[in-house]
């Protein structure tokens, strides 16, 4: 696993001049460096750049992520002079929550306004099975919109605007944990940090956007999710889902050992070209080779599997023949297959497969020796179910031609 660190990419914030109980805000005209989302190595470099000892990075990271503290004045094991210096030059500011909804089934959704006024969403899904010991899974967004244009996904219909910064990605997790320290309608500024507890147990990079097309900020965020000084999640509890950006799959395999999920949705190239257009660039043979490399070649003694995500579309990809093709495609790849009932959205050209059809499809996979689950739809009453993360924004079907043309350069950078 590579330990190379990227240069510091500071997230400069302009925030209003008022100070609150737990989140210190600064003058609009004064740009400050947001420390949220910096890895320990990046933060150590930042401290060296301001003439401080790099070990301070560990102290500050623990305050931010283990105690939820964003006001430097409350970081009591830092010297007064350092606290003053940080207050003058830095900040810890998660993205602004402009809307939140709590579903009847316990699902929570937040709409964030990020720099520039764009909106993104994140969803927290609590397990409803007592055997799962209170598991709470956060579905995190990595981009504003998505450029991949999967034909069955409502999120893609708003087009792509920009990548999220590491602060905007990791801030989603910070806010989700903070929500358990406040009442439903209370401000995050009223968090009692003495009661802080990191309630989120699992993170899936499955929200808005393709994570591997925003590679460095996503990897930096996941490093902090795994760090014992920050959130301390185990590798099997952090999952990155990709539609198949093959070069970045190889890069990730060398750098960060997290769980991998593949948004497959079709067992042959002809159908996947229609449903998941990136398949035209990286067809199934290349995708499966990258998946096998991730499981077998990097650390063959470490038992891993790939999660295969497969949305069930009535009369499109749900026949017995499709199931048999999927069995042949996966072969000996250690896989857990997650069948996802389609969640309809306005002007969708697809329907949900019947329950009988989904179960028949599942039975073929199970009989072939694969672990196969059928995802329970959660949060659909607040438009938080899979494929519904479209945000409360205008439909942006006219995608950025410049972005589309730059994908190749970004993948190979």
UniProtKB/Swiss-Prot annotation:
Reactions it catalyzes: adenosine(2503) in 23S rRNA + 2 reduced [2Fe-2S]-[ferredoxin] + 2 S-adenosyl-L-methionine = 2-methyladenosine(2503) in 23S rRNA + 5'-deoxyadenosine + L-methionine + 2 oxidized [2Fe-2S]-[ferredoxin] + S-adenosyl-L-homocysteine; adenosine(37) in tRNA + 2 reduced [2Fe-2S]-[ferredoxin] + 2 S-adenosyl-L-methionine = 2-methyladenosine(37) in tRNA + 5'-deoxyadenosine + L-methionine + 2 oxidized [2Fe-2S]-[ferredoxin] + S-adenosyl-L-homocysteine
Cofactor: [4Fe-4S] cluster
Annotated [4Fe-4S] cluster binding sites: 146, 150, 153
Keywords (A to Z) from UniProt: 4Fe-4S, Cytoplasm, Disulfide bond, Iron, Iron-sulfur, Metal-binding, Methyltransferase, rRNA processing, S-adenosyl-L-methionine, Transferase, tRNA processing
Annotated residues for binding of S-adenosyl-L-methionine: 209-210, 241, 263-265, 343
Record: active site: 121, 386
PANTHER family attached to this UniProt entry: 23S RRNA METHYLTRANSFERASE, RADICAL SAM CORE DOMAIN-CONTAINING PROTEIN
Family: Belongs to the radical SAM superfamily. RlmN family.
Name this polypeptide is given: Dual-specificity RNA methyltransferase RlmN
Gene: rlmN
């Amino acid at each position: 696993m590579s330990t190379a660190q990227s240069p510091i990419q500071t997230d400069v914030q302009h925030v209003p001049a008022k100070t609150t109980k737990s989140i210190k805000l600064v003058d609009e005209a004064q740009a400050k460096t947001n420390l949220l989302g910096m890895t320990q190595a990046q933060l150590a470099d930042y401290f060296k750049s301001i003439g401080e000892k790099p070990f301070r990075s560990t102290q500050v990271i623990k305050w931010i992520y283990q105690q939820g503290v964003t006001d430097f004045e409350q970081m009591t094991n830092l010297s007064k002079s350092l606290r003053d210096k940080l207050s003058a030059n830095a900040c810890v500011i998660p993205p602004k929550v402009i809307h939140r909804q709590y579903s009847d089934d316990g699902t929570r959704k937040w709409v964030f306004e990020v720099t520039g006024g764009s909106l993104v969403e994140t969803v927290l899904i609590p397990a409803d099975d007592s055997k799962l010991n209170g598991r709470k899974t956060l579905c995190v967004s990595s981009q504003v919109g998505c450029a991949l244009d999967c034909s069955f996904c409502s999120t893609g219909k708003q087009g792509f605007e920009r990548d999220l910064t590491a602060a905007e990605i990791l801030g989603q997790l910070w806010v989700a944990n903070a929500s358990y320290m406040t009442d439903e309608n209370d401000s995050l500024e009223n968090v009692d940090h003495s009661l802080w507890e990191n309630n989120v147990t699992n993170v899936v990079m499955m929200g808005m956007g393709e994570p591997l097309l925003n590679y460095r900020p996503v990897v930096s965020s996941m490093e902090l999710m795994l760090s014992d000084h920050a959130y301390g999640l185990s590798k099997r509890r952090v999952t990155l889902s990709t539609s198949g950006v093959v070069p970045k799959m190889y890069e990730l395999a060398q750098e960060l050992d997290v769980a991998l999920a593949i948004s497959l949705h079709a067992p042959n190239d002809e159908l996947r070209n229609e449903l998941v257009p990136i398949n035209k660039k990286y067809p199934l043979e290349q995708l499966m080779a990258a998946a096998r490399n991730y499981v077998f070649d990097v650390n063959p003694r470490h038992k891993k599997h790939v999660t295969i995500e497969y949305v069930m579309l009535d009369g499109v990809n749900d026949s017995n023949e499709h199931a048999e093709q999927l069995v042949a495609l996966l072969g000996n790849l250690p896989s857990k297959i997650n069948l996802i009932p389609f969640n309809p959205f306005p002007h969708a050209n697809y329907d949900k497969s019947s329950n009988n059809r989904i179960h028949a499809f599942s039975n073929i996979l199970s009989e072939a020796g694969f672990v196969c689950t059928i995802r329970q739809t959660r949060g659909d009453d607040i438009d938080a179910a899979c494929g519904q993360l479209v945000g409360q924004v205008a439909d942006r079907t006219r995608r950025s031609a410049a972005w589309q043309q730059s994908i190749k350069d970004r993948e190979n950078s």
